[in-house]
Amino acid sequence: MNLKFTEMADRLMELPQAISEIQLEILERTEASKEVQDKITTIESKIKTDINNVVDANGKKVYSNAEAREAAFIEDANENEELKDLKTDYDYMQREISEKRIEIEKLSNDQRNIRSLLNFFANNSENSNQF
């Protein structure tokens, strides 16, 4: 039984470092995903600017209303391979971040549970020694 307590105590001491390492991974992935999001925004802005600048032979804007511009944007964005790749990368990064947050939550729960168990058994041990 003492071996289990020692293992739990060791695990309890390791968990803060493990949690900290995962938090740093989240920070790095968040920064990387922000860079990807900025690239996405830049490409989308360029597509919108290009659409706004399209004119016919008479110099009249081809996409004169918001609905037409939005439809053209969706079509152009769907055809832009770089944009599609960046969006796929961004979605993957966001998934990784979510999974890391779940991992932190699990480790935090483990930490609370181990602490509670050790406190419970320590208190019971003290009470049994009083008799």
Model-identified regions with their sequence ranges:
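Short, charge-rich amphipathic alpha-helices with coiled-coil/heptad character
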Residues: 1-27
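Short A/G/S/P-biased low-complexity tracts
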Residues: 8, 15, 120-126
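Extended alpha-helical coiled-coil "stalk/arm" regions
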Residues: 29-70
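Short, glycine/alanine-rich amphipathic alpha-helical segment
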Residues: 56-94
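Short acidic DE-rich linear segments
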Residues: 2-5, 123-131
